[in-house]
Amino acid sequence: MFNRRSLIKAMAAAGVAGSAFGLQACSNNVRSTSGKKVVVIGGGFGGSTVAKYIKRYDSSVDVTIIEPKKTYMTCPGSNWYLAGLVDVEYLTHDYESLKSEHDINVIHQMATSVDKAKQTVTLDDGQVLAYDRLVVSPGIDFRWDAIEGYSEEASETLPHAWKAGPQTELLAKQIKEMPQGGRFLMVAPPNPFRCGPGPYERLSMVADYFKRHNPTATIMCLDPKNKFSKQSLFMGGWRELYGQMIEWYGAIDGATVTKIDVENKTVYSEFDTITADVINVIPAQKAGKIAFDIGLTDDSGWCPVHQGTFESKLHKGIYVVGDSCIAGAMPKSGHSASVQGKHCAAAVVTDLNGLDMPAIRTVNTCYSLVGSEYGISVVGVYEPVDGVLKGVEGAGGVSKGAASLEERKQEANYAFSWYQSITKDIWHS
C-alpha cells in the first residue's frame, strides 16, 4: 500500500531525498494516485528518467512516454564514435526494459499538439491521450538562420552531428574519407548550448583519429566565445598529445562566423576566409519545437521553470526537464537531464499525493576524452538560492592540471564506466 513512508524510502534509495525531506515536510493528507495519468513527451535522458522514477516512487501512477524513435542513440559518447572507439550499437538503446520491467507505456508517435485546458496530448496518428500531469523533455532545436548560408538542408553537406543518429554517421564518414593532409574545420556554437565541453571533446576525438589515420591533417575551430568548459585542460592535452594539430580561435580573434558558402566549403569571419575539406557546423540552439508549440518558452528561446521542481513557470501542471529548461547554473548535459528527471519525478509524485516537495540539491558530472586513454572531468553541485540553481561553494571541481598519464588513463576509464552506468540506470534496469 502506498503511503508517505514508502515514498520517502523510494526517494532516498534513488538518492533524491535530502535532509530537508523529513516527515515534517510532508502533509498528512496523502491523496490516492490510483488512476492518475502522467504523459512524458520525449524519451531521452530526461524523459526516460522521469518516467522510470515516477513508477519507482509510486507504481500506481499510469505513465506513458511519447517518443517517435524506437531506439535512442545518445549524444554523450557520440564523439567517441567519431574516433572509432565505440560503434553505433554501443550508443543505441531501446525501451524494452521500461515497458517490461516498469510497466511504462511507450508510444512511438510524434506529439503534435497539447490542449492545456482539456489536459490532452494529440499524436500524429490522431490518438488523443489525457493526462493529470505532463512532462516535456524535447531536447534542442537549432537556430538555422543564425549564420547566413547555413540551413537544415545545408547540414546534409556540412553536418552538425549535434543530434545523434544519421548526422553522426555522416560526419564520421566525411572524417574517414578526408584527403591525407586535409583540413577539418569546426564552427562552434554560442552560449547557451547542449554539452558545454562537447565541441572540444569532438576536436580531441577527431585529432585522435587523425593521429592514427591521417597524421598530416590539420584541425581548426572558429568559436564565437572567448572561453569554454575545461579550457586549460583541453588545451594542455592537445599540446601533449597532438602538438600543433589543433588551432582554436575565439571571439577576441574575430572568429565569429558570419557567412558560409556551402557549395565551396568556405566560411567567412573577421578572422579570415577559410576553406576546408570537412566542415562541422554546430549551430546556435533553442528549446525543442514542441516546447514552442505548447507555449513553454520565453523570449530567450528556452523554458523557464521553478528550479526546485522543474514545473513550468508559464503553465501549471506541466514540467520541463533536460536541455530545453532554464536551470540556473546547471549546464545542459545528459547527466543534468537525468538528475533533473529524478527530481522532477519526485515533484510530480509529491504533487499528485498531496505532499510537499523538499528542498533539493542537484549535481552534474561530465567526463571528456582528450585522447583514447586521456580523460578529464568536471563536477558541479547546485542548490536553489532565491529560486535559482546556483553552484554550491566548495563542492565539485575539475581534474587537476598536473596529472600523470596514468591518472588521465584512469579518468578515461571512468568516462566509459559513467556512460555504462547512466545508460543502464535509465534504459536497462
Q: Which role fits each region the language model picked out?
A:
Residues 28-105, 190-231:
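Beta1-alpha1 glycine-rich phosphate/pyrophosphate-binding loop at the start
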Residues 6-27:
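N-terminal export signals
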Residues 349-387:
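Active-site-proximal substrate-binding core of FAD-dependent oxidoreductases
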Residues 138-212:
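Glycine-rich dinucleotide-binding loop and its adjacent helix/turn
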Residues 101, 105-113, 121, 129, ...:
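A Rossmann-like FAD-binding core segment of flavoenzymes
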Residues 325-360:
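A conserved FAD-binding loop/helix module that cradles the flavin
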Residues 379-429:
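C-terminal auxiliary extensions adjacent to catalytic cores
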Residues 153-180, 274-339:
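FAD-site-proximal beta/loop scaffold in flavoenzymes
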